[in-house]
Amino acid sequence: MKSLKSTPRSTAKRAAIGFVLAAAALAAAACGHLAMMGSAVERPAAEAFGLGPLVSEKQTYSATLQPVQPLRLRRLQSVPVLITDTQGRPVESAVISVDGGMPEHGHGLPTQPRVTALGSGMYQIEGLRFSMGGWWQLKLAIDASAGADRITFNLSL
């Protein structure tokens, strides 16, 4: 009778050990995947970080983030941004979309910010949230009379 009682326990014990080993293997694989993702992304030099002014990829526009308060973690924020042309004139009637994320972690922004025109080249990015500390990229796609272009801000929070 003892052997009958110990058999189910033994089988259950083996199944539990197998489950733990499988979970450990998955965790190790996930850590290796994250390490590969992090090493595949080259972090920009320190001088590439900041609020601007930055010139767009095609040299069409310049943008400067002008937060009223320092950017903060885990809070919804609104951030004004000044968009000018290469001569420093305000860009009016631009359509601006916001994207971004943490390149070293492989995820995007936790929110979907929207942009509202304020006038005189000023726009308000609303609903911006940074969920954790580290290197973030904030990407603005700007479409105005001079054409479409992109600007990427590197931020350390």
Language-model segments: which ranges?
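Intrinsically disordered, low-complexity segments enriched in polar/charged small residues
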Residues: 10, 14, 18-19, 110-112
